[in-house]
UniProtKB/Swiss-Prot annotation:
Homodimer. Interacts with FtsZ. Residues 23-36 have a biased composition (Basic and acidic residues). Belongs to the SepF family. This is Cell division protein SepF. Residues 23-49 are annotated as: Disordered. It is found in: Cytoplasm. The keyword Secreted does not apply.
């Protein structure tokens, strides 16, 4: 029990009670300040700069490559995927392959471009363009020529 509480209990005059009450309240306030954790300060971080779409010409020259390939077997699909992983666009001519193997390669490359966030587009009969996420394809090629297939099943 603190001394101010004792004084408050024993003194009868209003001035003395006020003085004792004041000292009691002051002690309570001091105790609360000691018990309260320090106030938290707001910390501000600088805002992240938005991603710039401007690339220097020299950088663009270094990263822009288009690889033209004409695979003959399905086993060459992994090499094509490696080009895509290396952030190079690939144009694939599948005319010298059987239709079954060409379909398998397109399926494999579709999964590859999905995994890397790229795109695959048909640009001609049995000709496809696969691009990684750093290459944008703008426009479309209209199909003015008929596609000649060995079978009646047209998957593409």
């Amino acid at each position: 029990m603190s001394w101010s509480k004792v004084k408050y209990f024993f003194f009868d005059t209003p001035e003395e009670k006020e003085a004792a009450q004041y000292s009691y309240e002051k002690e309570q306030t001091d105790m609360k300040k000691q018990q309260d954790p320090p106030e938290q300060q707001d910390v501000t971080f600088p805002k992240a700069q938005p991603k710039q779409n401007v690339v220097s010409i020299e950088t663009a020259k270094q990263s822009s490559k288009v690889v033209l390939l004409e695979p003959r077997t399905y086993s060459e699909a992994q090499g094509i995927a490696d080009h895509l992983k290396g952030r190079r666009a690939v144009v694939i001519n599948l005319q010298r392959m059987s239709t079954d193997q060409a379909v398998r390669i397109v399926d494999f490359l579709s999964g590859t471009v999905y995994a890397i966030g790229g795109d695959i587009q048909k640009i001609g009969p049995k000709t496809f363009m696969c691009t990684p996420e750093n290459v944008d394809i703008v426009g479309a090629i209209s199909e003015l020529f008929g596609e000649e297939d060995d079978t009646n099943i047209k998957r593409w």
